[in-house]
Design a protein with these regions (language model features):
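A short, structured beta-strand-centered segment in the mid-to-C-terminal lobe
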Residues: 1-5
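Intrinsic disorder/low-complexity segments
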Residues: 45, 104, 114-117, 124
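C-terminal cap/loop subdomain of S1 sulfatases and analogous C-terminal strand-loop tails that border
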Residues: 6-9, 14-92, 110, 122-128
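A short acidic/glycine-rich loop-to-helix N-cap element
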Residues: 100-106
């Protein structure tokens, strides 16, 4: 199942029987604990700075990834202006170790376009 660190708080509060607010970004993972084949979300988002500077320094590039059950798509963006500098696409069904970047394959461009829109709407909070 796809999970994110922000799912930890709602999971722990539910397990402890505590109330939460409806505006939490995370989702409780209790349904997965009860039925491991169940899903609670269709995507997971990650963000990775490059280079990975210590606290207080500005990164040059930020990687924004969206992970589905099958794919991980990443846009490497200039931190200052948001321009996309590179893209990665990996098919975890056939390439779980992410050895072959599929982002430049013509037959994957439609998939990439859809994942890019979903990434913008979720991680970057814009509407297309």
């Amino acid at each position: 199942a796809l999970v994110e660190l922000l799912d930890l708080y709602p999971t722990l509060t539910e397990l402890c029987g505590l109330k939460t607010t409806d505006d939490l970004q995370g989702k409780s993972l209790v349904p997965i604990l009860e039925k491991p084949d169940q899903t609670v979300k269709e995507v997971a988002i990650t963000q990775t700075p490059r280079p990975n500077y210590p606290r207080g320094k500005t990164p040059q590039i930020m990687g924004y990834s969206i992970r589905t059950e099958q794919y991980r798509y990443t846009e490497w963006r200039n931190f200052s202006n948001g321009d996309v500098k590179a893209r990665d696409l990996y098919d975890h069904t056939y390439d779980p170790d992410e050895m072959t970047n599929l982002a430049k394959r013509r037959d994957k461009q439609s998939l990439i376009a859809g994942l890019a829109i979903k990434l913008e709407q979720t991680a970057l909070k814009t509407k297309r």
